[in-house]
Amino acid sequence: MSKGQAQQQSAFKQLFTEFFNLGGDFSKVSKDLKKPLKTYVKESYPHFLVTDGYFFVQPHFTKEAVAEFHQKFPNVNIVDLHDKVIVINSWSLELRRVNSAEVFTSYANLEARLVVHSFKPNLQERLNPTRYPVNLFRDDEFKTIIQHFRHQALQQSIAKNTKQESLPDISKLSGADAAGKKTKVDGGIVKTGASKGDEFADFSFKEGSTAVLKIQDIFVQEKGKDALKRIQDQQVESVQVQPKVRGGAKGKKKAATKSATKKTVAAKKTAESADVRKSVDKIVKYTPNKPSSRKETPQKSQSAPAAGKSSAKRTTTGSKTKIPANPSPSGKKSTKTTDQMTMAQFKKYLDWHEKKKGGKTSSGGKVLGKRSAGKASATSGKASKASKRSKK
């Protein structure tokens, strides 16, 4: 089934479209469309809305129709027909000018009103709409029909009220401008028909004037004024009550007084300064002492080595020597992970190391420290070599 065929199944759209195409004259509507209408009540209060399964419209009940209904069905209220089926036996269409800002079942300040003269409920029948009905006056195609109707009415008004003699002479106006004469701004504007401000109102259709009852008046007849007042009060309360929102960002707290604000700021500053002092103390505690000069020898360790740790070298007595607390003197540190020493620095290191052990160093930087027993010295070795050469 195509989209156009589905739209043609809407009885309300077909009926109201033909009504506008015929100039808003219900007497010209085809008799085939004036049959009883079986509709489903979408809403019964505060608006009475009926639907054909595709679009909904607002019926308007005459006083005689309401009286007949109450006489034939005394145990059924009109305002309680929600979700029920009604059959509209006698009805008519009227075209009225309204304010579309106030009447939602209208468009471009025009309303095609469904006037109900006789109807009955069909309580045994239940309908299950397959789609959610929408407002007929919000359908794009139907709004185009109404716009076309207004355009035709505007053309008819211009053709009827505009005569050749009443049209302004444009040549005179242009000549006056060329001569430097002053002319009125609205001299070339043609006004036709009656209008209210910028709104066109010169329609040729006969506006309907059938008296109908408001749904609020029908509610009072069936349930009384007190019930109506209670419902209206509930509606007002539901509008005034602000919904509680849960989750999301928390709301802003109320602004505190100036004194409380000052106390809070002072407490924050004190806490921040205390944190800074703690951080500085930790840095000072775990930072090793740096020698003031590169030539200075590191100070002796004043603290005992940690438990389980000792130097790998032992003295002649068997006791372990302590590792200096500070590193040995060296040059500037390189960008690598270890220090690189020059030859001069290495010689200084040897001098320092021998002094630490109690040995002696030569002026050339050679070590002249203690030697173990049983080993010949360098001078004795040289003398023995010289004696061997002389013997030969």
Curated annotation (Swiss-Prot):
Q: Where in the cell is it found?
A: Nucleus; Chromosome, Telomere
| UniProt GO molecular function | telomeric DNA binding
What protein am I looking at? Telomere-binding protein subunit beta
Q: What is this protein's gene name? A: STY43
Task performed by this protein:
May function as protective capping of the single-stranded telomeric overhang. May also participate in telomere length regulation during DNA replication.
A GO term from the CC aspect: nucleus
Compositionally biased tracts (Low complexity): 257-268, 374-384
- The segment annotated Disordered runs over 234-392
Q: Which portions of the chain have biased composition (kind: Polar residues)?
A: 328-343
Primary location: nucleus
Biased composition range(s): Basic and acidic residues: 269-284
Oligomeric state and interaction partners are given as: Heterodimer of an alpha and a beta subunit.
Lineage in the entry? Eukaryota, Sar, Alveolata, Ciliophora, Intramacronucleata
User: Which species expresses this protein natively?
Assistant: Stylonychia mytilus
Domain of life of the organism encoding this protein: Eukaryota
Q: Which InterPro entries match?
A: NA-bd_OB-fold, TEBB, TEBP_beta_dom_sf
The Basic residues compositionally biased stretches are 247-256
Q: What are the protein's UniProt keywords?
A: Chromosome, DNA-binding, Nucleus, Telomere
